Amino acid sequence: MQTHVRRVALQALRPCLRAGLMAPKFPVRFATTAVSGELLTKTPYTRPGYAAQWTCLVVLFLKNQLLMRLFFAFVAYVVAMKVFGARFHVDHDEDATPAE
């Protein structure tokens, strides 16, 4: 029962412990991590550097811009076909007399 009370109290006070506003009076196992050690993966993970992060952001932005522009071009084409039909030019009769 005492372990459960400690765990509940620790869960409630975890933000204060992380911020350094309180010092625990008893040894705590889960003070700094919200996930138990058994659930953590053993593979080492290193965060990407700033260059990799910015490269990823730029690539995603350009990809999304390209898709958006292609989509709008397709929509404009469909609307133009519906409004104007398949003809985009006016036929000229070469044999007609010039208008005066």
UniProtKB/Swiss-Prot annotation:
A GO CC annotation given for this chain = mitochondrial inner membrane
**Location relative to the cell:** Mitochondrion inner membrane
Give UniProt keywords alphabetically: Electron transport, Membrane, Mitochondrion, Mitochondrion inner membrane, Respiratory chain, Transit peptide, Transmembrane, Transmembrane helix, Transport
The primary location reported for this protein is: mitochondrion
Keyword check for DNA-binding: no
What exactly does this protein do? Answer: This is a component of the ubiquinol-cytochrome c reductase complex (complex III or cytochrome b-c1 complex), which is part of the mitochondrial respiratory chain.
Name the chain's protein.
Ubiquinol-cytochrome-C reductase complex subunit IX, mitochondrial
Give the organism, scientific name.
Euglena gracilis
